[in-house]
Amino acid sequence: MTEDQGFSDPEYSAEYSAEYSVSLPSDPDRGVGRTHEISVRNSGSCLCLPRFMRLTFVPESLENLYQTYFKRQRHETLLVLVVFAALFDCYVVVMCAVVFSSDKLAPLMVAGVGLVLDIILFVLCKKGLLPDRVSRKVVPYLLWLLITAQIFSYLGLNFSRAHAASDTVGWQAFFVFSFFITLPLSLSPIVIISVVSCVVHTLVLGVTVAQQQQDELEGMQLLREILANVFLYLCAIIVGIMSYYMADRKHRKAFLEARQSLEVKMNLEEQSQQQENLMLSILPKHVADEMLKDMKKDESQKDQQQFNTMYMYRHENVSILFADIVGFTQLSSACSAQELVKLLNELFARFDKLAAKYHQLRIKILGDCYYCICGLPDYREDHAVCSILMGLAMVEAISYVREKTKTGVDMRVGVHTGTVLGGVLGQKRWQYDVWSTDVTVANKMEAGGIPGRVHISQSTMDCLKGEFDVEPGDGGSRCDYLDEKGIETYLIIASKPEVKKTAQNGLNGSALPNGAPASKPSSPALIETKEPNGSAHASGSTSEEAEEQEAQADNPSFPNPRRRLRLQDLADRVVDASEDEHELNQLLNEALLERESAQVVKKRNTFLLTMRFMDPEMETRYSVEKEKQSGAAFSCSCVVLFCTAMVEILIDPWLMTNYVTFVVGEVLLLILTICSMAAIFPRAFPKKLVAFSSWIDRTRWARNTWAMLAIFILVMANVVDMLSCLQYYMGPYNVTTGIELDGGCMENPKYYNYVAVLSLIATIMLVQVSHMVKLTLMLLVTGAVTAINLYAWCPVFDEYDHKRFQEKDSPMVALEKMQVLSTPGLNGTDSRLPLVPSKYSMTVMMFVMMLSFYYFSRHVEKLARTLFLWKIEVHDQKERVYEMRRWNEALVTNMLPEHVARHFLGSKKRDEELYSQSYDEIGVMFASLPNFADFYTEESINNGGIECLRFLNEIISDFDSLLDNPKFRVITKIKTIGSTYMAASGVTPDVNTNGFTSSSKEEKSDKERWQHLADLADFALAMKDTLTNINNQSFNNFMLRIGMNKGGVLAGVIGARKPHYDIWGNTVNVASRMESTGVMGNIQVVEETQVILREYGFRFVRRGPIFVKGKGELLTFFLKGRDRPAAFPNGSSVTLPHQVVDNP
């Protein structure tokens, strides 16, 4: 059988999981399971304990960490035990000093030495002056030996004249229980040292007292008193074990909460970091921060805004680079759509790496065009140099595509320096873009360039300061725009050897570490893997992997690099699992140490006397905190009453009141216990009782009342027994001899005070009440016993002392000798008793123990409040992290489709990894504002063009708001390109895009399959109506030119480091041509699209054949409207943004 076995108690498991379990986000790539089991230890010295008391964490490393934490927490309670020992020494000093005589010198000196040692030990432990190993391994046992020695020295030196079986039994029981609640040891050693102490104490008393017995009757009385001692010790040990279990469970709960909270926090932080990295790979940080700030605004604040928020910033003196693949059409014809996208993905991933190397901000990828900017958002003086180096590296990088495809592809690069307006437009699918006349110039610089060369403008040339050799570019001869604007252009001469040196010097060594060349040409292989959901993932191997493959081709014995990589990945995951577990445990230990050193309660968050939180709201939250261990606390009261009854029955077996109070009290306490445990085990009790129990747990005054009832029952049982005993054994009063008392409880009345000590123990076990309530209850116990000791039982204790110490004197003479403050006789002899009268010593003992337990209760409440504050702090931290994650997630899903964002947030992706999804039946739409170019100016009246873009932002935002309509839920915005809006329908793989219940395409009719295309056509008509509404309100005359098409596409993301979602294929190209060759104010479609949409009631006008670049002549139609209204899910029409409804 294994050492640890799964814990199978259904009740406990349900409660434990309900208290401690948390929902952890799935994280398959972490490599380590985040669920840890609470098991039962089936070996060791505590095997005799119940299963629920033998808890252990799995794995063993977690249990070891917990034991370190638990002992560290208990180390502070060790100081409490030192205080207990010091109070006991003070008690002995007082008891010896008030009746000082020559025979009291030895116990007085021993107690004084013990007190000094206690103080020294307290200071050493408090200040941390002892080595950690000594403090945790040696001091607990040393303190136990010191306390045990003090008890036995007090027993042997103070009671040397006449020993009794009850001597120091109360103190022994007190310290045995104290060992369980204070010593920073495991349960097994505490049980062992406690049992050893009790056995030795019992044997010493039994042997010593037995030597003084003179007849058989006294022997029977001794036997009953020894058995009473055993029950006192047994009660202290049982309740001590339960208190240890309760403390262990409370700390396990705090530890597990800390562990799981740290796991969740780390997981959320990791996911939040992934989201932030993804977000910042698409948007610059200053734009993303501004967006997050606005997203957190209240809806009321947003409603007060007159216009939609626009995130646009002006950046001056930046260099803009446009790069286009020359021969892309030839390349497209040589590759399938998927192969082409994989090729572009790998190429643009390399460009992204180069962009990071040369401090470029990638703006967008438009088909085969790549453009970026240097000097944004942070200004760089060498922005022009960086852009030139970037262009040269891109020209060199395209060579591997040329070699692989055996085509004449090349790069044409244009660079211009000027001012841009950078930001995002619209409210959905945010993408960072730049606008300005200088951006147009940079675009024309690329168009007027030469393949394989970097074409720069005069403004860029002015920023180079002679860093590169150039030659005239003559761009005006190849581009009418450049010729019209009179822009001088140049071509970079990159053939000279000093270019690499210039690259390093121009970047001050920052871009090219260790003198590495700008780029390294390679011809990597493209690996494709098909996923079950139909998506294709492709990874381009790095240059190092390509070299390995070449080596493998030359040498057949060379190991397969792919297989080695897979094996290495598997080994890395195993190592990562172990490292993650070790890292988490280390972080947990640091977090726990940080908590402990924070001393949160000592920062005056609480009042000094009452220990209540200064914040009333915090105090209210603490007061309603449920205490799951209240049932165990009340069960301790039942154990205490049982042992109390056994002790009293053994001392006085003839007194019937002992039996009656035991039965009645036990029944009442069982009722209280059941009512408290119903909330812990709800399936075992009626619903009404469970509800009542839960109400008690969360209601402070009800908890206090329940606790007071339990202690009141214990006190009344003891008081009734004491008073009944007095009445039963009181004989007739005689003037000469006093009260004649004999038999039963009169033989040793100290035991009734000892059982009161058990009532004090039961009081501090009440975990659901505050230390002030416990103090009140302990004052009740101590006050009741004190009143009986000093008044009702005064003659009882006097008679007991007389029989023990002055057997031959009459009671009146003995009473005279028992005066504590009497002076020595005239003859020089001491006529006082050798001890303080028992009625006073027992009373003082009760008060000392009460003060000790009150001190411990304050410590326990401070710990409980500290754990509560830790819990609140951890909860608040998780809430803050979760809130940030939620906003980041909202921002990320507004930049990428949700299913695509989940793919990239799930695990770390390689830079060249491709996410793609093939679709056979998709609708694509392009909608542009051709006359916006005439509207846009950069005059000062328009704030350099910003106000023009603000108006464009309003138009695009209104288009975006249409997508919130349930009718258009199947439509996905792809992107905006300047003033062109691109959308598609049916590109969400995990949603039934057609809105019908048919599960397979074969089972659907054509009308079902193409419903999303009809929705896209309705969306295009709604965009036209929206623009008309905007024109009417702004007195403008903007017109849309829209093109639509249907067919198959490949949707996916290019570049995992800087993901760019787009769709590719012939369908997209034709839709784009339908827009560019269209007529303003019309929606142009090809014949295949017209045939499908006609079935949905759309009206068309035949335009006729038109020439489309790359496609020849195509028959096209203009979509004019719809005869039948669209079938909206709720029967309502589309509400246009800012629509003004005319009242009849």
From Swiss-Prot:
Enzyme class: lyase
Gene Ontology MF terms in the entry: adenylate cyclase activity; ATP binding; calcium- and calmodulin-responsive adenylate cyclase activity; calmodulin binding; metal ion binding
Tissue: Detected on cilia on the olfactory epithelium (at protein level). Detected on cilia on the olfactory epithelium.
GO cellular-component term (any): nucleus
Residues recorded as bearing Phosphoserine in the entry: 523, 578, 1076
Activity regulation as described: Specifically activated by the G alpha protein GNAL/G(olf) in signaling cascades triggered by odorant receptors. Activated by forskolin. After forskolin treatment, activity is further increased by calcium/calmodulin. In the absence of forskolin, calcium/calmodulin has little effect on enzyme activity.
Residues that hold ATP according to the record: 324-329, 366-368, 412, 975, 1062-1064, 1069-1073, 1109
All ranges on the Cytoplasmic side of the membrane: 1-79, 402-630, 854-1144
Catalytic activity: ATP = 3',5'-cyclic AMP + diphosphate
A Gene Ontology BP annotation from the UniProt entry: acrosome reaction
Low complexity bias locations: 534-543
E.C. number: 4.6.1.1
Membrane topology recorded in Swiss-Prot or TrEMBL: Multi-pass membrane protein
Free-text note regarding domains: The protein contains two modules with six transmembrane helices each; both are required for catalytic activity. Isolated N-terminal or C-terminal modules have no catalytic activity, but when they are brought together, enzyme activity is restored. The active site is at the interface of the two modules.
Known role: Catalyzes the formation of the signaling molecule cAMP in response to G-protein signaling. Participates in signaling cascades triggered by odorant receptors via its function in cAMP biosynthesis: specifically activated by G alpha protein GNAL/G(olf) in olfactory epithelium. Required for the perception of odorants. Required for normal sperm motility and normal male fertility. Plays a role in regulating insulin levels and body fat accumulation in response to a high fat diet.
Protein name in the entry: Adenylate cyclase type 3
Annotated source species: Rattus norvegicus
